[in-house]
A protein has these predicted regions:
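Basic, polyanion-binding surface patches
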Residues: 1-173
Length: 173
């Protein structure tokens, strides 16, 4: 029998192999970029994506007030911008200005997306619910855009305090 070591449940959750990293944008006038690893596809039909945000974060209130948001998948070349947006509060700094990332107007929502990201999803907020120490904001994807020749190997993931890219493909389904 394989020997297993018991661990604290929170530490156990952090052993999940990887979480995608996204830059979420919320708001038109008072906008902010937040780095998130709690992101999940909740449904394919209709297409629903959710992000989990702690109530103590500045973006939490902005997400509550806004009818929409964008989810943006950054490539590995944006790792410094991703870290900056995760370490600074939007209360204190305009993250678009400080990072040099470019807001692009939404096609179907008021909130901008990030031009430099590999993939942009425009989402209309359809549901909000609290789970433990996070609030989940669920959005229906109303527009999706990707760079031509999108290579998912460039997308950032987060695991055990490290930003990574995808690894070896073992086998197709």
């Amino acid at each position: 029998m394989t020997v297993k070591i018991e661990m604290n449940p929170v530490r156990g959750i952090r052993t999940f192999p990887a979480f995608p990293v996204v830059l979420a944008v919320v708001g038109k006038e008072e906008r902010n970029i937040i780095t998130l690893a709690l992101v999940h596809v909740f449904s394919f039909n209709p297409p629903l994506i959710g992000v989990g945000i702690m109530p103590s974060r500045h973006s939490h209130e902005l997400f509550h007030r806004s009818p929409d948001f964008s989810i943006n998948i950054p490539g590995k070349e944006l790792v410094e911008e991703v870290i900056f947006c995760g370490e600074r509060s939007g209360k204190d700094v305009d993250k678009f200005e400080k990072t040099g990332m470019t807001p692009i107007p939404g096609k179907k929502i008021e909130t901008p997306s990030i031009d430099e990201c590999l993939v942009n999803f425009e989402c209309r907020k359809v549901q909000t619910f609290d789970t433990g120490d996070h609030t989940w904001f669920i959005g229906e994807v109303v527009t999706a855009r990707t760079v031509e020749g999108y290579d998912r190997e460039r997308a950032l993931i987060y695991w055990a305090g490290e930003f990574r890219t995808l690894g070896e493909i073992i086998r197709g389904r």
